[in-house]
Amino acid sequence: MSYPVVSEVEFLKEVRNVEGKAKKKHFKDDRVTSPFFSFIKLDEVENNGVLSIRFYTDFGKESREIAGKEFEFGEAGKYYEYIMFFDVVEKIEPGTYRYGIFVNDRLLYEGKLIIYEFE
């Protein structure tokens, strides 16, 4: 089984589907505050599956999952050049977090996200 490629990850103030295209609104100075939208684009997607994004506290041994979203996608036997996913993530306190992007529980991508106080 081949896995898709994560080609884009953004945390946005707003995102909408306008005629099949993502219309994005970024945070001023890229200072993400809660609530926010997670936007993920996968390339080279085969078959169906479940994409999830999970947010974790810090980077130490005591790290724990604090939020997450899941998206079912695709059909068995089909190929998609790309698929875009987006949804709002609510109520994450200001701080530094790490996140992981998984397809069928396999980690494909991870990163760090700073959530700022609402100004």
Residue ranges of model-derived segments:
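Contiguous beta-strand segments within globular domains
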Residues: 10-46, 81-83
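Short beta-strand/loop motifs in extracellular/secreted proteins, especially
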Residues: 47-51
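Solvent-exposed serine/threonine-rich low-complexity stretches and specific carbohydrate-binding patches
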Residues: 64-76
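Short beta-strand edge segments in extracellular beta-sheet folds
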Residues: 70-73, 114-119
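A glycine-anchored, Pro-Gly-centered beta-turn/N-cap motif
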Residues: 76-80, 93-100
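Short, surface-exposed loop/turn segments at beta-strand-coil junctions that are enriched for proline
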Residues: 87-91
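Short acidic/polar inter-strand loop motif in beta-rich domains
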Residues: 103-112
